[in-house]
Structure formats: C-alpha cells, structure tokens
Regions:
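A generic secondary-structure signal for well-formed alpha-helical elements
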Residues: 13, 97, 147, 178-185, ...
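Aromatic-Pro/Gly-enriched surface loop or interdomain linker
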Residues: 51-119, 126, 246-247, 254-256, ...
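C-terminal signal-anchor/stop-transfer transmembrane helix together with its immediate cytosolic
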Residues: 1-51
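An acidic, glycine-rich "communication" segment
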Residues: 64-67, 157-257, 263-274, 278, ...
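Helical hinge/lid and interdomain linker segments adjacent to catalytic or ligand-binding clefts
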Residues: 77-169, 211, 242
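Extracellular/periplasmic catalytic domains that process cell-envelope and extracellular macromolecules
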Residues: 60-63, 112-116, 135, 142-144, ...
Length: 305
C-alpha cells in the first residue's frame, strides 16, 4: 500500500498537480524527476511517531480510489443533501457504468487537499461566506490543473439566464466567489458539445428543477472541424454552472428512497437528472475520449473509401 501511495505521489508531482501552477510550468523535466526521487526518499525514511499518527487510511482512500467530492457549506441540510446526492449518483454509476467510485468525500476547503479529485460539487447558498483569498488561490490552482467544479445555485436558473434584471441571492454570492478565480468565457452547453454524448445522448441537464441551462467554458469555433458530431473534448471545462439543484434530484436515503421530489413530479425527469450526472462525471474523468469515439463511423467510412 505504501509503494502504491508513493507511485501515485510521483505521478502527481511529475504532472505538476502537487505544485503551484506557476512553479510547475517553470520546472524542467530533469529537475522534476530529481525532485520526485527526493520526495520518495523523504517519504520512505523513518518518521517520528507523531508523523506516523496521521490519517493514512484517509490519504490512501483519496489517492487510490476515484471519489466524487462536495464542498462543505456549514449548512447542515445542504451538506446532508450534497452527501446523499453523491451517494445516489455513485450508486447509479456503479449500476450503469464500468466506473465504481468510492464513498463520496466531504471537502473542507480550509484544510483538505483537492489534488486527488477530478469532480467537485459546490452548492451555493445565499448566506455563504466567500472563502479568503488564499483558499480561493487553492481553488484556482485546482481548476487550472485538471479539476472541474460544478457550482449549483439551486435556484432553477433564474440566476444565470441572460435578460433578467435581478439575479438571485445565490447567484450574487456565486459572482463574489468567482471574482477570486480566473473564470474563462462561458456559454450554455451547445448541442454538439461532448457533454451531450459523454455516456448518454442528452439535450438538457435537469436536476430537481429543469429551468436552468448548464454553463461551461465557451468553445472557440474551429473552421477546420467541419460537421463534427462532438466538440469540447480536448479541454475539459474547469467550471460548470447550473441552477437545477442536481444533488437534490440524486439524493437517496439509507434505504434507497428518494429524498426530494422533482418539480414537476416526473420520474422521467429524475432519470434524466441521473443521466446528466453520469455524463458530467464521465466528461470530467475522460475528457476527449468520447469526442474521439463519436467520430468512429466517419473514420471507418473514410477508411473504406
């Protein structure tokens, strides 16, 4: 187990995930390799008893098992809903896909490391405290080094829809939070985006509500792409924004009962909410895989010619 952890750390270090992005960009490959060796030697050296008392099991779980994660807000009901939602989505992923995530992880932004996660669900509340600048710097680094955050304002999309004269309190809070990170231009998911095809074929991404668009990093037009069936695979959007209260649609009790009704009450809407969650998770984990896969018919046709 210890060797597996060291191997995982070495991979993360060499990829720059354990370094600030500015440092990683300037670090030569040879220096990175040397640093990784020194890091390994330091970790396998005998440590004082106090250091050995660290929660190794928790570290192993984060490093060696894919886990969906959510941000703790301090609101017990919201946090319980986030946990129950990711439990429900995890169970759905295990049942319908080859992915078998571990138990969802609750993330305290002030103390927990983000480097081990690719998917982070962040419900935004009207009374949320904007994290301090140093914490948001950590969030910004996470987003710039391969992580994706799903911000959910849970307000049915009234917050984000263009043309509204007033935004919801949740959206105003989200804007204050995002002021501390480098947010790319955003757009509603276009019909040809890989998110619409990452696992299921989808035309919308509902949650408990269904009035909100799903916003992602805007894709630049590629004049050489032609009539491509999917775009957006090469670079995974570091930020996804919805107002559809996704976690509430996914949330299940310990005995498997749904905790919240969809609005309107429609079993099909809940099924589509789960499928939306699957596509988002697969997109954050696989990136351009599905964008390549959907081109296979065209490639085979050209090979035949």
């Amino acid at each position: 187990a210890a060797l597996a952890v060291l191997d995982a750390l070495a991979v993360l270090f060499l990829s720059g995930r354990l370094l600030p992005s500015a440092v990683a960009a300037r670090l030569p490959a040879r220096a990175a390799g040397t640093a990784a060796i020194l890091l390994t030697l330091a970790l396998i050296a005998p440590q004082p008893a106090a250091a050995q008392d660290q929660p190794v099991d928790e570290f192993l779980a984060a490093a060696l098992k894919t886990r969906l994660a959510y941000v703790l807000t301090g609101d017990d009901l919201i946090d319980e809903t986030s946990h129950a939602g990711l439990v429900g989505l995890t169970a759905y992923l295990r049942e319908r896909t080859a992915l078998e995530p571990g138990e969802p992880a609750a993330i305290d932004l002030t103390s927990d490391e983000l480097v081990f996660y690719s998917f982070l669900y962040w419900p935004v509340t009207a009374d949320a405290q904007v994290p301090p600048a140093d914490i948001m710097a950590k969030v910004d680094t996470f987003m710039k080094t391969g992580g994706t955050i799903v911000f959910d304002t849970r307000d049915a999309g009234g917050a984000i829809t263009p043309g509204l004269f007033t935004a919801s309190e949740e959206t105003e809070r989200l804007r204050e939070i995002l002021a501390f990170v480098d947010v790319p231009p955003l757009e509603p998911v276009p019909p040809d985006h890989v998110l619409t095809k990452a696992f299921y074929l989808l035309s919308e991404f509902p949650g408990r509500w269904r009035g909100s668009d799903l916003w992602v990093e805007s894709l630049s037009e590629d004049p050489q792409a032609g009539d491509r069936p999917a775009r957006g695979g090469d670079g995974v959007s570091p930020i996804i924004i919805t107002g559809n209260d996704m976690a509430a649609a996914w949330a299940v009790s310990a005995d498997g009962r749904y905790l919240y009704p969809t609005v309107p009450s429609d079993p099909r809407q809940r099924e589509m909410a789960y499928r939306s969650g699957v596509n988002i998770v697969m997109y954050t984990l696989t990136g351009n895989y599905k964008a390549d896969q959907v081109h296979i018919p065209a490639l085979l046709e050209r090979l035949g010619q």
